[in-house]
Amino acid sequence: MQRGLIGLGKMGFNMRARLREGGHEVLGYDPRPEVSDVATLEDLAGALEAPRVVWVMVPSGTVTEQTSAALAGVRSEGDLVIDGGNSRYTEDAPHAKLLADKGIGFVDAGVSGGIWGLTEGYGLMVGGSDADIARAMPIFDTLRPPGPVEDGFVHVGPVGAGHFAKMVHNGIEYGMMQAIGEGF
């Protein structure tokens, strides 16, 4: 299975490795040529067979907006974009609409596991249509921890729900870390 992955930082780099170990053919793009498999987003689009599935693992905010706009220009009808960065859930609907206007599907994925996800698997909280989630399940099955699906993957609702769940997860986690820190 051929996939694209944009953003090869600590997590994206390891996700590419885990997907490759799981039998996926992954082409990665990053502005840093020493880790990138292709030179540009256009090269990535041209190298992948349509319909394409591309995972985006870039920081939230302006970079995500710029990447979504760039992808709308180089993707075609039937493609699917998965935003796995820590995007704000309220930004997902506008990104999904921008892509939907071109016939491109969108899934938001809250990802937990950090750099340990390479060996342990990633906890995945995803939002999107049933059809888009089903299409991306081979990716999710490879990235999640081994064992029962529900131990590492949940489809929490429509577009935006995955990043909302990740926000709640982070709030609880950071609150617990603060409480532990206060106790010592």
Residue ranges and their predicted role:
Residues 41-107:
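Rossmann-fold NAD(P) dinucleotide-binding segment
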Residues 3, 67, 88-182:
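Rossmann-fold dinucleotide-binding core
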Residues 1-52, 75-78, 115-117:
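NAD(P)+-binding Rossmann beta1-loop-alpha1 motif at the extreme N-terminus of oxidoreductases
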Residues 30, 41, 85, 110, ...:
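Residues at the C-termini of beta-strands that transition into short coil/loop
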Residues 32, 59, 112:
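Short beta-to-alpha linker loops that shape the active-site pocket of alpha/beta-hydrolase fold enzymes
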